[in-house]
Regions:
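Non-catalytic alpha-helical scaffolds and adjoining flexible linkers that form interface surfaces
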Residues: 1-24, 28-253
Length: 253
């Protein structure tokens, strides 16, 4: 073998079966971003790589890339962590599938982004440990992911006067902008995609985007304030990426 072996650590986002023996997996890796790995023989139950490259398995991979190929070839693999709770709850699994599809859509192949990998792993951990409900996990992932790829909305204060706190704010999905109750009618022309927010909802959005990764899942939001947050996070993703996701339909059903 003349190609250089390289060790990467990451989680399997997607798998494509080629035949009864082989498959291709897409891995969100710490070192190379999202890459495609060809795993020869991995479909066989007795294959040494079978458990290491299962969907949503976090593993160490030793790979090499042949010249003039978009695929990495798998040389070795070992499991670091399996999120067993995903297979026990259809809501958990369907959210993980949506997170995977969204991540593949917005990341650039072979472009390293450790923050996205940390976000993905932390969200799965919080969800499977049942520390947050699945809808809160979804909203946090969506908004933090948009911020990590450069589409952070302006939720620090009113876009017109800079006000940090108000009884009511208005968030405009298409613009990613927020206005206080005093400025909204003068600074905007009452667009259709506007959502009214109270301060607890605003603080939740700020936490999703601005808090340290270890702290962004560490607060409680009362149910009356959750729905506007869920709506903003989902619709903002759809607006910024310009498409819908089949896995989102599956999650919502």
């Amino acid at each position: 073998m003349t190609e250089r072996l390289q060790k990467v650590t990451g989680i399997v986002l997607k798998e494509t079966t080629l035949n009864e023996n082989d498959k291709i997996v897409q891995v969100l890796s710490k070192e190379l971003g999202v890459i495609k790995i060809y795993a020869k023989g991995a479909m066989r139950l007795k294959n040494k790589f079978h458990s290491s490259i299962g969907i949503f398995t976090y593993s160490d991979f030793v790979v090499y890339k042949p010249a003039n190929s978009d695929l990495y070839q798998l040389n070795e693999a070992s499991v670091k962590h399996i999120f067993h709770g995903l297979s026990e709850n259809i809501d958990f699994l369907s959210l993980a599938m949506y997170m995977s599809e969204l991540t593949v859509e917005v990341t650039v192949p072979n472009d390293k982004n450790n923050d996205i990998l940390r976000l993905f792993l932390n969200t799965l951990h919080i969800m499977t440990s049942k520390r947050w409900n699945v809808d809160m996990c979804k909203a946090a992932f969506e908004m933090r992911l948009m911020a990590d790829i450069g589409f952070m909305p302006n939720i620090v204060g009113c876009c017109h006067c800079g006000r940090y706190e108000a009884e009511t704010f208005y968030f405009i999905i298409s613009k990613g902008e927020m206005y206080c109750q005093n400025c909204f009618h003068t600074a905007a022309e009452l667009p259709q995609d506007v959502i009214k927010l109270k301060m607890p909802s605003v603080m939740a959005l700020r936490y999703f985007i601005l808090a340290d990764m270890e702290q962004m899942f560490s607060f409680d939001l009362a149910k009356p304030y959750q729905l506007p947050v869920f709506k903003i996070c989902e619709e903002y993703v759809l607006k910024q990426t310009g498409r819908f996701y089949n896995t989102l339909n599956f999650f919502k059903d």
